Amino acid sequence: EYLSNIKVSGDALLNIINDILDFSKIESGKMELVEEDYAPMSMISDLGIMFLTRIGEKNVELLYDIDPTLPKTLHGDGLRVRQIIINILNNAVKFTERGYVKLSIKVEDKTEQDLVLAVSIKDSGSGIREEDQKKLFQSFSQVDSRKNHSKEGTGLGLAICRQLVEMMGGQIGVRSTYGQSSEFYFTIRQKISEESPVASLPEEKKTLQIGGAFSNTYLQENFERLVRAYGIEPIAPDVMAKDRPHVDFLFTDTLVYEEHKDAIHGSLL
């Protein structure tokens, strides 16, 4: 327990130091974007693992809505894009005790050379008062709208996000209903490094038998959409229950697994 507390305190201190350093660089005009190729889906996967760990024992689902036309490789400052998303996700997880945190990424205004990446993070937390929403992106601003939470950090996180988004020529904003939910969103233009959508898989891989069964309808629909993006038709839960086909990979959650573990093991044999 002591080691865990030390780690948490150390991480918090490191985040504060990083915020101050980034803010100082931006204010002095020394912050530079480092543009290079990056894989957005790989970034999203890493973030998923990171935040499932941070959610821990909370009764919160981490949901995704990813545009299937998102190219495999983009060209931009992927580390700063990741930093912006992490900062907003951190706040969403911190202020949501039950319900969901949803990361959505859409492709807009796409040309042969570039596209607009439209990112939103929505949560079912306690929301933010309208008068406080205007302060969120100001430097050293900490609002106490959110119930039962103490102020933490420097108050620089969202200000840094705003400045990074603006450096990329984009816009950032928030929509919130106090007592219900919040949605932070931003848009940035990114170059397309390789016109290769996430859907691309070698032909021999498209014969894979992939099934999915989730207790949550939203998760089920998103799973099927992502699998179809790879050119594979997923095996639906009713087909698996009725015909018991062989599947190479089966994705499920704990509730479904515990209820149907015998049938699941039979399909994978």
Question: What are these model-predicted stretches?
Answer:
Residues 24-35:
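Helix-loop junction within the histidine kinase core
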Residues 128-142:
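Short conserved segment of the HATPase_c
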Residues 169-175:
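Glycine-rich ATP-binding loops of the HATPase_c
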Residues 152, 157, 161, 173:
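Short alpha-helical Gxxx[C/S/T] motif in the catalytic ATP-binding
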Residues 65, 87, 110-114, 131, ...:
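Disordered, acidic interdomain junction associated with two-component signaling
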Residues 59, 200-262, 269:
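Cytosolic transmitter module of two-component histidine kinases
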